[in-house]
Amino acid sequence: MLRLLSKRFYCKIATKSNEKATKLDFKQLTHPTKVPQTPVDAEFPDTSASEIQIDTKTIQLLERLSLVDLDSERALATLKSSIQFADKIAHINTDHVRPLYTVLEHQQLQLRNDQVTEGDCRAEVLRNAKVTDEDYYVSPPGNIPLEQ
């Protein structure tokens, strides 16, 4: 773990818990390292003219995987516009773009040691849930309301 963090100079493990927290200097945030200062001109293909066809099997698969009801025209239109947007950004050239781990790469961020400070509060945490089953939260599946 330490070897991984040593490559990322912006991560530093706090060795003392009583160190005074340093505030970020927002004046230094005006020149991020990897974010370009000027927009990059790029030609995007016009995908709005082509009509996107989605067959019934694909819609049923998406409904099952995402637990979202796509029966309404509004939901189907949102899905189609999302596909058109994905088509546009798929053509962006990212060959020489280095990965951006955080926008604060020039700031050293303090990390605390990975130690349990409080624990054994399962009952207290589960009291926050409306519905539980044994020791688990029960959440509604997607946009379908949970019946009480």
Swiss-Prot record:
Main location: mitochondrion
Tagged with keyword Transit peptide: no
GO BP terms in the entry: glutaminyl-tRNAGln biosynthesis via transamidation; mitochondrial translation; regulation of translational fidelity
The UniProt record lists the keyword Transmembrane: no
Keyword set, alphabetical order: ATP-binding, Ligase, Mitochondrion, Nucleotide-binding, Protein biosynthesis
GO CC list: glutamyl-tRNA(Gln) amidotransferase complex; mitochondrion
InterPro entries xref list: Asp/Glu-ADT_sf_sub_c (IPR036113), GatC (IPR003837)
SUPFAM superfamilies the record matches: Glu-tRNAGln amidotransferase C subunit (SSF141000)
HAMAP family: GatC
Family per record: Belongs to the GatC family.
Assembly information from the UniProt record: Subunit of the heterotrimeric GatCAB amidotransferase (AdT) complex, composed of A, B and C subunits.
PANTHER family tied to this protein: GLUTAMYL-TRNA(GLN) AMIDOTRANSFERASE SUBUNIT C, MITOCHONDRIAL
Anything else known: This protein may be expected to contain an N-terminal transit peptide but none has been predicted.
The protein's name: Glutamyl-tRNA(Gln) amidotransferase subunit C, mitochondrial
Protein's organism: Drosophila simulans
